[in-house]
Amino acid sequence: MKGKYFDTGWLKPITPVTNQIVNDKSDLAFADKDILFDWLAFDVPRGTHKLVSASLIHQGNHGARQAETDQQLWLARSIDGVAPPSLGTPNVAVSGTGHRKHMLGIVHIDQTQATGDLSPFNQFYSTAMAGSAGSLNNSGSLVIESAPNSGSSAGFDRVYVAGITMGAVNFSTNVLLNQAGNQGATTTTTTLTVNGAAATKVFEVGDVIQAMDLAAIGTITALTTTSITVDLCEAALEDDDEILTTSPIKVKLAFEA
């Protein structure tokens, strides 16, 4: 924290690969009002804060731009040391119960802010807000107060964020293992040869990746358009396995103390 402003850094919520694609590589698109990711905890300095900006980076689809749809970020806090109950399964509409009393507010990300973006990743920047009643405004005045003594270290409290899509999105990658001899499991650094979509348009260093059948791979340490270097390969892979990241969405929130 520096001065009266601080941000979360880029948070990497988990969207399980099993909820992004069918294990035979068939696409498994998210529909309007589906859960993108369930509650992710982060810590903020103790006290009351105003949310001043929210940013999302979306992975594209098959190396191309992601569908430009509105998104919502739901913010919540713990009560009596209990985290907000799960919203449900990603890629399905909200089915969980008991989370309403934990809610702090809703941030609405307007897709029009993404128009003309030339980045290989889809970036959304917006300060449009929605209060708990759901009416949109542009004041940027969502104020949150976390639950006291709920953080992981002294002087910090815990807040939770979850994501909801307001339109169809698809995180299948079409990045395919291109090794006729397949790939064995290894505990050492290895480089995977890939084809299909350019790996550099889908992934970035630091991403944790898996195959479409949930075969665990590892963390990306280097990339080219046709190769992915990882710190290890936890499970054996087969030629033409589709590779996905466990965090296709990244979120950054900034606050005024």
Sequence positions of predicted segments:
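C-terminal interaction-tip segments
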Residues: 1-27, 148-177, 244-257
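Extracellular and analogous surface-interaction loops
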Residues: 37-48, 146-152, 195-200
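Extended extracellular/luminal ectodomain segments enriched in beta-structured repeat modules
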Residues: 44-53, 66-68, 156
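Extended, low-complexity, turn-rich repeat/linker tracts enriched in Gly/Pro/Ser/Thr and Asp/Glu
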Residues: 58-68, 167-172
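Short coil-to-beta strand junction motifs in C2/discoidin
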Residues: 65-72, 247
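Short edge-strand/loop segments of extracellular domains
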Residues: 72-84
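Extended, solvent-exposed segments with strong compositional bias
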Residues: 94-149
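Autoprocessing Asn-cyclization modules and mimics
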Residues: 171-246
